[in-house]
């Protein structure tokens, strides 16, 4: 398992892997799914945010476009390493409502260190053909993002499932 230990260089500092990225909602005024332990770990230097939620929150998005800094606005350290998931898939509607370009624009505006590409999750309940289609579309969106991206952060392609068994397969 030592092969998983690496050091990633990000715009806001070095990151030793493996690493925990708790959802900290630094891009969201509420804390409905921020784990309680995030306040108990004084040196927790990572956070995961949802780029789509930030972009859809018009007052906040306008402030960021006007030059506000997300880390400062939300009261976290400037050295916090932020992973910004695209957030493009809405589980309630099961629709994709963003593009790789819009997602990258948002992720770069909030100065994300690690940027996740737009993806649609896989599921054991789906037929293999449907999951294969989703994987292919995710790959194409990742390639579009890669071809469009010229920033300093790390662009990670996202393909995932609902559970560990789906991910392993």
Per-segment meaning from a language model:
Residues 1-150:
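Non-catalytic, usually N-terminal nucleic-acid engagement modules in DNA/RNA processing proteins
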Residues 148-169:
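Glycine-rich phosphate/ribose-binding loops and adjacent secondary-structure elements
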């Amino acid at each position: 398992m030592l092969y998983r230990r690496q050091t990633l260089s990000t715009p806001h500092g070095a990151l030793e892997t493996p690493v925990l990225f708790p959802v900290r909602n630094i891009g969201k005024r509420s804390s409905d799914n921020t784990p309680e332990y995030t306040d108990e770990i004084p040196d927790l230097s990572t956070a995961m945010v949802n780029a789509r939620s930030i972009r859809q929150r018009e007052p906040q998005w306008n402030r960021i476009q006007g030059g506000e800094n997300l880390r400062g606005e939300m009261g976290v350290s400037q050295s916090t390493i932020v992973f910004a998931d695209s957030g493009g898939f809405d589980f309630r509607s099961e629709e994709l409502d963003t593009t790789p370009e819009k997602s990258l624009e948002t992720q770069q505006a909030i100065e994300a260190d690690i940027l996740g590409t737009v993806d649609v999750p896989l599921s054991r309940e789906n037929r293999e053909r449907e999951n294969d289609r989703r994987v292919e579309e995710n790959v194409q969106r990742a390639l579009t993002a890669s071809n469009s991206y010229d920033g300093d952060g790390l662009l990670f392609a996202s393909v995932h499932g609902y559970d560990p068994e789906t991910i392993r397969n």
